[in-house]
């Protein structure tokens, strides 16, 4: 059996107790690979610990808008965060890619924090279908994969509310919700588990 289980987490926002709770659940689920879709920092108090934890526990980390904003802007109003995170971790955040793509059981999946065009764009579930389909284009943001193709499945974070949308031609758009700061009126961490044959280009 070549089926892999991939956990996708996002939007921890310095909430270490929530991150530890999610990883307790991940351990129970025999996960093979862990991907984090960014926003490690901001809002919560434990940004430094969250960065260190995700850096060593996740197989892939992509940047979020908070990670990019805090590490690039270096504004005085963010001094509290910047002093606690420290320059070495800020440099780590600056170097994170913006997207990752891979094949799973014949479907090409691409994951990023917020949008295929810009980490600061927002994609809400009530937007028009034309806007949603833009998420499947070859990203204009930096990426870890070299696949010059549109995606079959897209997963993202940013809006702190999990949903799944089945679109035309078998396309699937999903949001993983938030580990540390949910906005969906459910005061619990959420994350996604994908199952399939990792790296398999043929449909299984």
Placement of each model-derived feature along the sequence:
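Short loop/helix-cap segments at secondary-structure boundaries that form the rim of catalytic
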Residues: 53-54, 102, 164-169
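Acidic, His/Gly-rich catalytic cores of divalent-metal-dependent hydrolytic chemistry
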Residues: 165-204
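Structural motif
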Residues: 6, 33, 60, 109-110, ...
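Active-site-proximal beta-strand elements of phosphoester/diester hydrolases
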Residues: 5-13, 108-115, 173-177
């Amino acid at each position: 059996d070549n089926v892999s289980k991939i956990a996708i987490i996002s939007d921890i926002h310095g909430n270490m107790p929530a991150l530890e709770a999610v990883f307790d659940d991940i351990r129970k689920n025999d996960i093979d690979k862990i991907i984090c879709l960014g926003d490690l920092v901001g809002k919560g108090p434990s940004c430094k610990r969250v960065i260190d934890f995700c850096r060593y526990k996740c197989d892939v980390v992509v940047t979020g808008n908070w990670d990019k904003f805090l590490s690039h802007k270096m504004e005085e109003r963010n001094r509290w965060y910047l002093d606690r995170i420290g320059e070495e971790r800020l440099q780590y955040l600056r170097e994170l890619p913006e997207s990752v793509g891979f094949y799973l059981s014949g479907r090409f999946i691409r994951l990023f924090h917020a949008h295929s065009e810009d980490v600061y764009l927002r994609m809400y579930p009530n937007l028009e279908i034309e806007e949603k389909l833009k998420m499947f284009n070859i990203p204009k943001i930096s990426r870890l994969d070299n696949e010059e193709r549109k995606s079959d499945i897209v997963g993202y974070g940013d809006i702190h509310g999990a949903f799944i949308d089945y679109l035309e031609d078998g396309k699937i758009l999903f949001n993983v919700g938030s580990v540390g700061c949910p906005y969906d009126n459910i005061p619990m961490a959420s994350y996604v588990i994908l199952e399939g044959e990792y790296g398999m280009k043929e449909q299984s």
